[in-house]
């Protein structure tokens, strides 16, 4: 049975994971350090698959934090789209590739292309980057850098997971592009808010 029919995309992912529209938040089934993947497989909560989609969830929270700031409406729209895609990725990573028969939302090539197009548009208005940039400038820019670092961690974990289990290659590509997008977004927001972009000057002994 496809539980995703006629539900908004974000709700679809939650219903895929929870399998029912109404369920208690606490189940007590994880009290001994195990949790269930989509498909029913029980694994330790420190399993790399759990680490992977847990880090994607952490990333999504940071994306939400950025979207709540006073930034351009267009950026907010794109960030909400990214949040939806991260739920899709979370559902994909939470499914046991060998046992899950439930329909999981799809990540598309168009989702990756959107990030690339957004980066290209933002870069048109930015000064050429000739040096490494120190994270910071103002609070919102710093949030972008925090999200970027969490995104890189999520990417590293999914790459490690893919060495021993199936992971849709579009997932790792999307996370790679997203970390770049967050870097460019931070620069764009910094430029729009007249934040100082501090460059890294290596200290070299003469």
PLM feature spans:
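Phosphate/pyrophosphate-binding loop motifs in nucleotide- or prenyl diphosphate-using proteins
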Residues: 18-206
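Short Gly/Ser/Thr- and charged-rich N-terminal loops/segments
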Residues: 4-14
């Amino acid at each position: 049975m496809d539980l995703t029919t006629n539900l908004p995309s974000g709700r679809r992912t939650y219903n895929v994971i929870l399998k029912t529209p109404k369920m208690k938040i606490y189940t007590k089934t994880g009290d001994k350090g195990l949790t269930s993947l989509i498909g029913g497989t029980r694994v330790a909560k420190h399993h790399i698959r759990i680490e992977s989609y847990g880090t994607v969830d952490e990333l999504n929270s940071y994306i939400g934090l950025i979207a709540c700031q006073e930034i351009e409406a267009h950026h907010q729209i794109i960030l909400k789209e990214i949040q939806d895609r991260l739920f899709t990725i979370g559902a994909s990573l939470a499914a046991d590739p060998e046992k899950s028969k439930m329909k999981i939302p799809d990540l598309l090539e168009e989702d990756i292309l959107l990030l690339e197009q957004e980066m290209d548009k933002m870069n048109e208005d930015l000064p050429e980057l000739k040096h490494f940039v120190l994270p910071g400038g103002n609070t919102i820019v710093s949030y972008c850098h925090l999200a970027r670092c969490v995104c890189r961690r999520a990417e590293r974990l999914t790459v490690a997971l893919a060495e021993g289990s199936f992971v849709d290659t579009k997932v790792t590509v999307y996370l790679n592009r997203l970390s770049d997008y967050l870097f460019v977004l931070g620069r764009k927001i910094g430029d729009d808010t007249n934040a100082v972009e501090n460059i890294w000057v290596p200290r070299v002994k003469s």
